[in-house]
């Protein structure tokens, strides 16, 4: 279950549907990803086809990422079956 966000625009999109703080062309994919994140109870629940689920390293150690489009990713921390600090970023 989603517990917290880092990205204010993504948080607004999740709660209100406003696209002001996200790339509008990513809206459909973001809805799909957020729905899966919110329902997940294990990290394997997030390893759906095309997700590109991977554990980050270096300064983002202990965070996971799933692919949105191109270089855009949803990153988050997974702990005890919950999702924290959800971010929407182009980190490459």
Where are these regions (language model features)?
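N-terminal, well-ordered alpha-helical segments
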Residues: 32-35, 54
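A short, surface-exposed loop/turn module that caps and links secondary-structure elements
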Residues: 41-64
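Arg/Lys-rich, positively charged N-terminal/basic patches that mediate binding to nucleic acids
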Residues: 1-33
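Generic structural signal for well-ordered secondary structure
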Residues: 3, 27-30, 46-49, 67-69
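A secondary-structure boundary/capping signal
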Residues: 6, 49-52, 87
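Enriched for short, Lys/Arg-rich terminal
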Residues: 64-92
């Amino acid at each position: 279950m989603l517990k917290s966000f880092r990205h204010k625009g993504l948080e607004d999109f999740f709660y209100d549907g406003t696209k002001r703080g996200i790339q509008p062309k990513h809206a459909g994919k973001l809805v799909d990803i957020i729905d899966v994140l919110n329902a997940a109870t294990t990290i394997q629940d997030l390893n759906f086809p095309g997700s590109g689920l991977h554990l980050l390293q270096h300064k983002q150690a202990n965070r996971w990422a799933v692919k949105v489009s191109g270089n855009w990713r949803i990153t988050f921390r997974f702990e005890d079956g919950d999702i924290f600090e959800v971010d929407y970023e182009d980190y490459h």
